[in-house]
């Protein structure tokens, strides 16, 4: 059995699909379906069992959780604006620690979701404590377990890998609401209003020129499975493309892919702007000084760990995403 926590969530459900594509169906999916809507993310997946996350946690604490082949731990509170520190630390730090202790006691590989939020305002995205300084309790909840792993690295009984996800986009994120990716919101905006809105220039960047390391969830799944295939490798690794691209690229990919559906030719950025298909709104005063205008993962450690696949750029990945959702007609 392989455990996937957060299995009905965005990255978790895509991981289940990735395992299914390999013919792996003996999966224990752990999540919280109290509100129910996320079940849709698992409808087309094959799993062996579903378990509520609190039931799984009770078994962990009692030392009664069955031994499994591996744990892919994606379950967490991913709302970076959550201000309840106790809730965040319990869900993100403490639960990860409990899975870690279980996996070490039973010699089970653990691959868990960390976050690029650990870097805070740093402009150097290398997996080194000198570059880390989270700006919110979400980032701290992720950093604290990374620090635990560092102190235990020379005593591990089984693989432990922390993946610092950058800006992930792709299918099955619709339940995330305002925390969904820029690509998702751009799609909804264009379909509803016929144009996409981006922030105007600030902090030395042109209109829509603020940049992020946008990574397709398909590449995130591939990275997870790479480490699952290499249980002798442990450590903390950035999970990004190593390529920063502006928000303009995301918006252009969304609009041009949707235009192509109607048989319309692609437009350049200047043409998209001049025709009012991309519009810029004033940069919010309350974000000035608190906004990351640029992120770009250093992927040297990831490459050194043997992951050599070419990752999708925004033009490829976002277009795939748009076509997928339109084919499913599930964008709302």
From Swiss-Prot:
Substrate binds at residues 167, 178, 185, 199-202, 212, 291. Its EC number is 5.1.3.20. The active site is at residues 138, 176. Keywords: Carbohydrate metabolism, Isomerase, NADP. NADP(+) binds at residues 10-11, 31-32, 38, 74-78, 91, 142, 168, 176. InterPro entries: Epimerase_deHydtase, Heptose_epim, NAD(P)-bd_dom_sf. It catalyses: ADP-D-glycero-beta-D-manno-heptose = ADP-L-glycero-beta-D-manno-heptose. Gene3D superfamilies: NAD(P)-binding Rossmann-like Domain, UDP-galactose 4-epimerase, domain 1. Catalyzes the interconversion between ADP-D-glycero-beta-D-manno-heptose and ADP-L-glycero-beta-D-manno-heptose via an epimerization at carbon 6 of the heptose. HAMAP family: Heptose_epimerase (MF_01601). This is ADP-L-glycero-D-manno-heptose-6-epimerase. It comes from Bordetella avium (strain 197N).
């Amino acid at each position: 059995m392989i455990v996937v926590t957060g299995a009905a969530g965005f990255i978790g459900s895509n991981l289940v699909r990735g395992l299914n594509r390999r013919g792996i169906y003996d999966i224990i999916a752990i999540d919280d379906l109290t509100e129910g809507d996320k079940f849709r993310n698992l409808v087309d997946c094959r799993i062996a069992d579903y378990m509520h996350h609190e039931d799984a946690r009770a078994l962990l604490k009692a030392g009664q959780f069955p031994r499994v082949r591996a744990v892919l731990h994606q379950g967490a509170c991913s709302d970076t604006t959550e201000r309840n520190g106790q809730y965040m630390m319990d869900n993100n730090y403490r639960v990860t620690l409990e899975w870690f202790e279980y996996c070490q006691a039973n010699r089970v590989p653990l691959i868990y979701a960390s976050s690029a939020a650990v870097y805070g305002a740093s402009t150097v995205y290398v997996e080194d404590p000198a570059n880390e300084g989270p700006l919110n309790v979400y980032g701290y909840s992720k950093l604290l377990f990374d620090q635990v792993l560092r102190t235990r690295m020379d005593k591990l009984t089984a693989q432990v890998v922390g993946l610092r996800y950058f800006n992930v986009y792709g299918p099955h994120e619709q339940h995330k609401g305002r925390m969904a990716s820029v690509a998702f919101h751009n799609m909804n905006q264009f379909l509803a209003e016929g144009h996409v809105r981006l922030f105007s220039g600030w902090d030395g960047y042109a209109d829509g020129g603020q940049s992020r390391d946008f990574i397709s969830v398909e590449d995130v799944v591939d990275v997870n499975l790479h480490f699952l295939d290499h249980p002798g490798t442990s450590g903390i690794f950035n999970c990004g493309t190593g390529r920063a691209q502006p928000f303009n690229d995301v918006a252009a990919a969304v609009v041009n892919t949707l235009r192509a559906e109607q048989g319309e030719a692609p437009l350049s950025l200047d043409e998209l702007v001049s025709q009012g298909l991309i519009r810029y709104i004033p940069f919010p005063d309350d974000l000035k000084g608190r906004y990351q205008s640029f992120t770009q993962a250093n992927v040297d450690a990831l490459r050194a760990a043997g992951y050599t696949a070419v990752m999708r750029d925004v033009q490829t990945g976002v277009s795939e995403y748009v076509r997928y959702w339109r084919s499913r007609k599930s964008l709302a």
